[in-house]
Design a protein with these regions (language model features):
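Conserved Rossmann-like nucleotide-binding pocket used by diverse enzymes
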Residues: 3, 8, 28, 54-56
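Short, intrinsically disordered C-terminal tails of secreted or membrane-associated proteins
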Residues: 121-124
């Protein structure tokens, strides 16, 4: 089971769109095998980027409107938000290193100077 924050229509604005740090949203379903396989990879990414990348989960079966709003047709689908704006999407499985590279590619140049430490070090050495 993932340690990511469960997000629904009720708290999507607060947890994702109003977040002061980048947010990776995992659209998933309980019955989805690949979704279960990516969960530990997302947990590993969350541990490595703690405090500088938020990872949340949206159950597509419980959040049809939210899934439709973002055009979710396959799962797992990951959406990356920065400053309330959708900046990238990824569909399917990926390991922690691929996920980190995905995040790096899409937000590294957008990170403010306050982002330091292991998160930046990991980006520079991937």
């Amino acid at each position: 089971m993932s340690n990511a924050i469960a997000v629904s229509e009720a708290n999507f604005q607060a947890e994702v769109l109003d977040s002061t740090i980048p947010v990776l949203v995992d659209f998933w379903a309980e019955w989805c095998g690949p979704c279960k396989m990516i969960a530990p990879e997302l947990d590993a990414l969350a541990a490595e980027t703690s405090g500088q990348l938020k990872i949340v989960k949206v159950n597509v079966d419980e959040n049809n409107d939210l899934s439709a709003r973002y055009g979710i047709r396959s799962i797992p689908t990951l959406l990356l938000f920065k400053g309330g704006t959708l900046v990238a999407s990824h569909i399917g499985l990926a390991d922690k290193n691929a996920l980190l590279a995905f995040v790096k590619h899409h937000i590294y140049s957008l990170l403010p100077p306050l982002y330091t430490g292991a998160f930046i070090t990991a980006y520079k050495h991937q």
